[in-house]
Amino acid sequence: MPEDSNTNDNNKRPLEDNNAVDGESDDDIGPMLPPPPGEDAPRKKKRTLAHEKLYLDQLPCADMYEKSYMHRDVLSQVAVTKKDFIITTSVDGHLKFWKKTASGIEFVKHYKSHLSSIVDISISANHELLATISDDTTLKVYDITNFDMINMIKLRYKPKSVCWIHQSGQAQALVAVSEADNSNIHIYDGHADGKPLHTLSKMHSKPVHIIEFNSRFNCVVSVDAIGMIEYWSPEAPFALPDNLDFELKSQTDLYEFRKKKSVPTCLTFSPDGLSFATMSFPDRQVRLFKFLRGKMFREYDESLQAVSEMQQAGTTIHHLDDMEFGRRLAVEKELEKSNQARFVNAVFDNSGNFIIYGSLLGVKIVNIRTNKVVCLLGKSESNRFVNVSLYQGAPKKKAVYTLAMIASENAALKESQELDPTLFCTAFNKNRFYMMTRREPFDDINQKAERDIFNEKPSREEQTVAATQERKQILGTSAIIRTTSGDIHMRLFPDAAPKAVENFTTHAKNGYYDNLIFHRVIKGFMIQTGCPFGDGTGGESIWGDDFEDEFSREFRHDRPYTVSMANAGPNTNGSQFFITVAPTTWLDNKHSVFGRVTAGMDVVHSIESAKVDKTNKPLDDIKIINIDIR
């Protein structure tokens, strides 16, 4: 696992220094002489990346996602093109085109592309063509710039993976499609009638689930179901290209997955084509390879065992409480068993110095030169982010700049050149995709819109959640009880006791509690108020009648400063409430807990210490001035 930039935890040593020049190394071979007396041993020079801050300024950095948009079903993949278009697909066969704008994204077009789940998509090297394949045995080709479907090929088999394998400017738009039930790979002309130009049946022995094209070196890399990796040329006779630095696979580390009995879920090339990254299951390793030599030079351990050990040792980059960590661990195990595991991926940034991928803790940005985690995106979110794609363009940028424009001091021109780095992510079992930017949600105080955009008709479950959230906002989640002895701040629990909270907040807003006294105070036990008669015999709910008890397993009378409803027996709640000053567990399942004091405990104890008469009523009235709901 890569190190946190703020810690000094030891990591697995990288297999090769990516920055080292041939013939140079940080380590000398053989034993070293001890340093002269009085001198410290020479320290190794730390690896650094020149201008790292400049690179980081062009990457997202927010703890939370800024916005999310919907599909009708669970999303499978998201892809970004160089021409500022975003493509999203879902398991119900739907495809959507979006356009990156200065303020976010805009919806462009929606296709019911396939009758079944979209298995894989591929964008051509010139970012002009999109190919999609589905379990409905069809291959569809789209013109990305014009958002049009320009070809449909009916396949005679169930496809597994798809990839454009032609370079920019090439006459034929070649696309490779693998079969799900055998090792065949078929090559088609994406603009033709669908008859295969070639069929490769001996390249692999098992079904191929990953095909990627390195346009710089005109080489295809394919991976099969047992982790075997093959390099081949996209032209007949489809042999090993001549421009590689090896002749035999035994000279490389391409057998690594077969040795470890693990299978990659992705293979992503760096922008310069010199490296590629993989993520794999079940060993959960992130590996980086030199493309020309096929040698592995980085390996990051993201296994559940490693993460659990770091959590227990307190050395994780973001420590979670035990309950949240256990929940995320369960989600990881569920993800590995699901079909969505095949969409787990890693991507490079434009500089090729950083790799970005989802993990249990959030989305990690790792500096592969220094082996440090430089940023953890979405660490405050509960989602498990799966498929990611990075945008690093300037959405306002003009196509052509004149010399006069460049030389001018035009503020609008400078603004048009500003980058808006955005990471687009899908999440496990979610019908939304998420945008991670350099902005936290609602950084703009004038922004009133929700960050979860309902661009599709929500399901019943989502409508219920939205209604609950809206109800919580109306009721309020905190209150300040202003008394003649001082202010008491409290947090409310609308989820656990919705009726009690609604009753309390409505009474408070209507001024019902204003000038009421604390009529019952018992030292070491509690302070009670809310009776309009001041003797504990009165008070009614906002509905006129008593309302039922609301007991919760999560919120009990197990600690002081618990705010609970007073009653005269089961289901007799009115307006009176009390605040405990000690654990009072015998009150559980007898009184409804609806809040806890978060500040002003000294005020509570001040009221508790007041002198009282035989009926436990303070000799000097202590009044509620008003209650502020927030």
From Swiss-Prot:
One of its GO terms (biological process) is protein folding. PROSITE patterns: CSA_PPIASE_1 (PS00170), CSA_PPIASE_2 (PS50072), WD_REPEATS_2 (PS50082), WD_REPEATS_REGION (PS50294). WD repeats lie at residues 70-108, 113-152, 157-198, 203-242, 258-301. Residues 475-629 form the PPIase cyclophilin-type domain. It catalyses: [protein]-peptidylproline (omega=180) = [protein]-peptidylproline (omega=0). Its EC number is 5.2.1.8. GO terms for molecular function: peptidyl-prolyl cis-trans isomerase activity. SUPFAM superfamilies: Cyclophilin-like, WD40 repeat-like. Residues 1-46 are annotated as: Disordered. The keyword Isomerase applies. Keywords: Isomerase, Repeat, Rotamase, WD repeat. InterPro entries: Cyclophilin-like_dom_sf (IPR029000), Cyclophilin-type_PPIase_CS (IPR020892), Cyclophilin-type_PPIase_dom (IPR002130), Cyclophilin_A-like (IPR044666), WD40/YVTN_repeat-like_dom_sf (IPR015943), WD40_repeat_dom_sf (IPR036322), WD40_rpt (IPR001680). Belongs to the cyclophilin-type PPIase family. PANTHER family: PEPTIDYL-PROLYL CIS-TRANS ISOMERASE-RELATED (PTHR45625), PEPTIDYLPROLYL ISOMERASE DOMAIN AND WD REPEAT-CONTAINING PROTEIN 1 (PTHR45625:SF4). PPIases accelerate the folding of proteins. It catalyzes the cis-trans isomerization of proline imidic peptide bonds in oligopeptides. This is Peptidyl-prolyl cis-trans isomerase cyp15. It comes from Rhizopus delemar (strain RA 99-880 / ATCC MYA-4621 / FGSC 9543 / NRRL 43880) (Mucormycosis agent). The lineage of its organism: Eukaryota, Fungi, Fungi incertae sedis, Mucoromycota, Mucoromycotina.
